[in-house]
Amino acid sequence: MSCNQDTEILMLALFQTIDLALNLYTWVLIASAIFSWLYAFNVINSRNQFVNAIGSFLVNVTEPALRPIRRILPNLGGIDISPIILLLIIFFIRSFMWNTLYPMTV
């Protein structure tokens, strides 16, 4: 194998790893939004230790990325669109990565 092929394989592995992490984080964001709706409408028991552990995990994983977006967005009266904005940002990052950055490395 040439050095160019090694670099190409390494870059592909790097891009696929980043893409997998962003895809996984997308699903965690969706799960967090659904969980918050279920919690808000009292569909799930908030005193259940397992439910509380899942909720804490989802908040701890998503809050660091959502907090800066919430600071920028205006208050919409109880409607939190920060997960939607973050999902759009992730979509654009993935699209930019595969359509612009990856072809430059090949």
From Swiss-Prot:
**Cellular compartment(s):** Cell membrane
Membrane topology term reads: Multi-pass membrane protein
Reading the lineage from the top rank, the first entry is Bacteria
What are its GO cellular component terms? plasma membrane
Does the keyword Transmembrane helix feature in the UniProt annotation? yes
Which key words are in the record? Cell membrane, Membrane, Transmembrane, Transmembrane helix
Q: Does the keyword Nucleotidyltransferase apply?
A: no
A Pfam family this chain is assigned to: YGGT
- Where does the chain cross the membrane? 24-44, 73-93
InterPro entries recorded: CCB3/YggT
State the family named in the UniProt similarity comment for this chain: Belongs to the YggT family.
Indicate what this protein is called per its UniProt record: Uncharacterized protein Atu2659.1
